[in-house]
Each structure stands twice: as structure tokens, then as C-alpha cells.
A protein has these predicted regions:
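A short, Trp-centered hydrophobic/proline-enriched beta-strand micro-motif
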Residues: 9-26, 63-67
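A short, well-structured catalytic beta-strand-centered motif of the EAL phosphodiesterase domain
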Residues: 33-37
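Short active-site oxyanion
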Residues: 40-44
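Short, structured beta-strand-loop surface elements
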Residues: 50-114, 124-127, 136
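Short, active-site-adjacent segments that bind or coordinate small-molecule cofactors and metal centers
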Residues: 118-156
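A mid-sequence, solvent-exposed acidic-amphipathic segment
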Residues: 157-175
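Iron-sulfur cluster-binding cysteine motifs and their immediate structural context
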Residues: 181-198, 209-218
């Protein structure tokens, strides 16, 4: 499973990502931001107390972040079909809390990544630091045209701080009659023959082609 360090480094490669919060009125807000540090407790971000972003995190206590990294943008052919270059998407969702001044001082003394937060607080006194301390997420590595491998995706889910996750991918039940229809229908090469047939969750895009093709609904 990916460590918090691994997750941070993937997001850091992306740079700025979409940070979504509950707006307090039944809706969702999002904005572009980034994580600036990590440790064993979680991922760290900073904002200012006058911003809706701050209020929404304090009142709602939840945060969801996603971003994508690819070497080239999607291109469209003459039939308006998209062609994606290999890349990956990262997402993480969980709880977020405000660090006290004492906590921040201790972390800044031990971890040089917090220097930017100290600098910002000195320059903009309303700057605060929050930590995503309990969360789950997924690395979705894609190569839809199979440029570098013989299957389209690799998914890896992770969690920390007591959060849990549902493993990626569908499953095949014992009702399977081993006819192979699901394997023929799967364009992601996620199905392995056996008794019963088995779906590799890390390759499964949950498109539903296998269920659609199965004559017994297994």
C-alpha cells in the first residue's frame, strides 16, 4: 500500500490540484491549491482565515483532493475520439483539522518542509496550517492505448489515520459457469480464468462489460 510519503510525492509531481469542500449550504466548492508537506500524521496545506476555504474546512471537517499528471494533453481525431497519453490520476478524501501554534512550532523545528508555512505566517499573519489526518484515496495509473504495457490501467488504493477503503474492481460470484464471455468482453484484460473466473481489481475499471456479457449474472 502506498505510504503517506508516496502519496505526497505523487501529488507534488502533479503540482496544483483541485481541493473540494462542503460549502455549508448543501453544495460543494472547489479551488486550486497544493499540499506543501507530509509526515506520519498526514498531508499538510495552508490557507488564510478570511477565506471560504478555511471556513468550510473548519465547519465541515472534510476535504477531497484530485489531480492528474500526463506528459501531453488529450488529442481528438477526425471522428472526435479522444486519445490519451499515458499518465496517472490521484485522489484522496478524508478529515482535516487545524494545527495549533504549538503543534506547528514543533513540526517546523523538526521538518524543513514546514519552512514555507513559517515564512507565510510571518508575512501574512492570518495564514494557518491544516492536516489531512485520516483519509483514503487511489492512484489510477492509465495507459489506455497500451503504449508501455499490455493492459490499460493499474489502480492502487490506500488509507491512513484509521480510514478504510473498499478494494477496487468488481468480483465474480460462485454462480460463474466458466464460459469465458466476461473475459472476451473485458477490454482491460482484468479477468483471469479459473473456478470461478476472477477479476484483478487493480486492472478493473468497473465499466460493467463483464456483467453485461455474463449469461447467468455472476
Amino acid at each position: 500500500m502506498l505510504s503517506i510519503k508516496d502519496v505526497y510525492e505523487k501529488f507534488d509531481e502533479i503540482g496544483c490540484c483541485s481541493f473540494a469542500t462542503l460549502d455549508g449550504n448543501g453544495g460543494v466548492d472547489s479551488r486550486i491549491a497544493h499540499f506543501f508537506a507530509y509526515d506520519d500524521e498526514g498531508l499538510y496545506l495552508r490557507t488564510m482565515t478570511g477565506k471560504p476555504f478555511f471556513r468550510q474546512m473548519i465547519e465541515g471537517g472534510r476535504l477531497s483532493v484530485c489531480g492528474e499528471r500526463t506528459d501531453a494533453p488529450v488529442v481528438w481525431d477526425d471522428e472526435n475520439m479522444p486519445h490519451f497519453q499515458p499518465g496517472y490520476m490521484m485522489r484522496v478524501s478524508g478529515s482535516v483539522r487545524l494545527l495549533t501554534d504549538e503543534e506547528l512550532s514543533v513540526k517546523a523545528a523538526a521538518n524543513p518542509m514546514f519552512a514555507v508555512a513559517t515564512y507565510d505566517i510571518n508575512k501574512y499573519p492570518e495564514t494557518v496550517v491544516l492536516v489531512m489526518d485520516s483519509a483514503w484515496g487511489e492512484l489510477y495509473d492509465y495507459d489506455f492505448n497500451m503504449v508501455h504495457r499490455d493492459h490499460k490501467i493499474l489502480r492502487e488504493r490506500f488509507s491512513w489515520g484509521g480510514a478504510t477503503f473498499v478494494p477496487a474492481g468488481f468480483t465474480i460470484t460462485d454462480e460463474c459457469i466458466e464460459c469465458g464471455a466476461c473475459m472476451d468482453a473485458c477490454t482491460h484484460k482484468a479477468i483471469v480464468a479459473g473456478t470461478p473466473y476472477r477479476i484483478l481489481g487493480e486492472r478493473c475499471d468497473e465499466c460493467g462489460n463483464c456483467h453485461h456479457a455474463c449469461p447467468v449474472g455472476a
